[in-house]
Amino acid sequence: MKNALKSSFWKDCKNFLDQNHIAYFVDAIDGDMAEHSASIDGDVLETFRKYCLYGGLSNFKNLWLYANGLFDNKAEKAAPPEKYSWAGIYDPGAESRFQKTLSDFEAAHPYGDRPVLGLLFYRDEWIWDDTAYVNAFLEEAEKEGYAVLPVFANGFIDESAGMPSLSEVLETY
C-alpha cells in the first residue's frame, strides 16, 4: 500500500475527494501511511482503524454498518470492533478453530512418539478461513507419520495493539 499511496493516480483521487468534500479512509499496514480526509474526527477514525486491524468478516461487515450509521440514524447499528486472538495454534476441529495454549492443543492432539513439524502461517488466513493449504499440509504430514503444530501470527507486528512479536509467538508455541 505504501507505493500505491505515493502514486499519481492516488494523488489525483485524493485531490478530487478533497476538492469535493468527500470523506475517505484508506487503511494501510503501516499505520502512519494510512490516509483519511480531515473531516473524519478522531473517534470515528479510531473505530475504522480497529475494524480493519482486528480483521475478519464480521468486523468488515460492521465497518460498513458503522459508516452507514454515520449518515443514516435509522440504519442497522454496528457491533463494536471484535478483537480476535493475535496468535494461536490452528485447530480446525475446535469450535473457535484454534487453541490458545500448547497444553490444550496437546491434550486434543497427543503426539505420542511422532516427530513434530512446525508450520507458521498468517493470522489473516485463519481469520478469513483461508486455510486450504494448511489443511492439506496437515493431512499429508499426518499420512507420513508426523504431528504438526500449525501456528498463526501476524506478519506485521504492532506491539502497541497488544500483538506479540514473532519471537514471543515462537517461544510460546
Residue map of PLM features:
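An N-terminal assembly and electron-transfer interface module characteristic of large anaerobic redox
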Residues: 1-173
